[in-house]
């Protein structure tokens, strides 16, 4: 009986090693955050950019009123969730210590169904994000920092 169980047990244990580990829920939320708000190196930051990005990222069913795209390095954005580039801000939110290049896309009105028309505003701002397990998962807002 032990001889029969040993090969079965061995196959079971080997099978566990081959089973892919599913990404954590936090990873999905982080990926969703990147899909909605991250564009490393934008090509132009005008109304056409907003039209294409909102459409390609599937943020137009219905037309989203406003969306902000953050440009730059993902690691700098992740660092907002740590003390390297972020600090506590209102509850569980974090505010960046450095500014990021951003593009704000605002729906110009009209129908809430595609094709959606957007106006673009480009700027450099500090940003506020919500973090879970060291990863940004929610974009809250951005601020223009005072120039000295």
UniProtKB/Swiss-Prot annotation:
The active site is at 37 (proton acceptor), 138 (proton donor). The keyword S-adenosyl-L-methionine does not apply. Its main location: secreted. Keywords: Angiogenesis, Cytoplasm, Developmental protein, Differentiation, Disulfide bond, DNA-binding, Endonuclease, Hydrolase, Nuclease, Nucleus, Protein synthesis inhibitor, Secreted, Signal, Stress response. SUPFAM superfamilies: RNase A-like. Its EC number is 3.1.27.-. Disulfide bonds join 50-105, 63-116, 81-131. Pfam families: RnaseA (PF00074). GO terms for biological process: actin filament polymerization; angiogenesis; antibacterial humoral response; antimicrobial humoral immune response mediated by antimicrobial peptide; cell differentiation; defense response to Gram-positive bacterium; innate immune response; negative regulation of smooth muscle cell proliferation. Serum and milk. A motif (Nucleolar localization signal) lies at residues 55-59. Residues 1-23 form the signal peptide. The keyword Iron-sulfur does not apply. TRNA binds at residues 45, 105, 127. Homodimer. Interacts with RNH1; inhibiting ANG ribonuclease activity. Belongs to the pancreatic ribonuclease family. Secreted ribonuclease that can either promote or restrict cell proliferation of target cells, depending on the context. Endocytosed in target cells via its receptor PLXNB2 and translocates to the cytoplasm or nucleus. Under stress conditions, localizes to the cytoplasm and promotes the assembly of stress granules (SGs): specifically cleaves a subset of tRNAs within anticodon loops to produce tRNA-derived stress-induced fragments (tiRNAs), resulting in translation repression and inhibition of cell proliferation. tiRNas also prevent formation of apoptosome, thereby promoting cell survival. This is Angiogenin-1. The gene is ANG1.
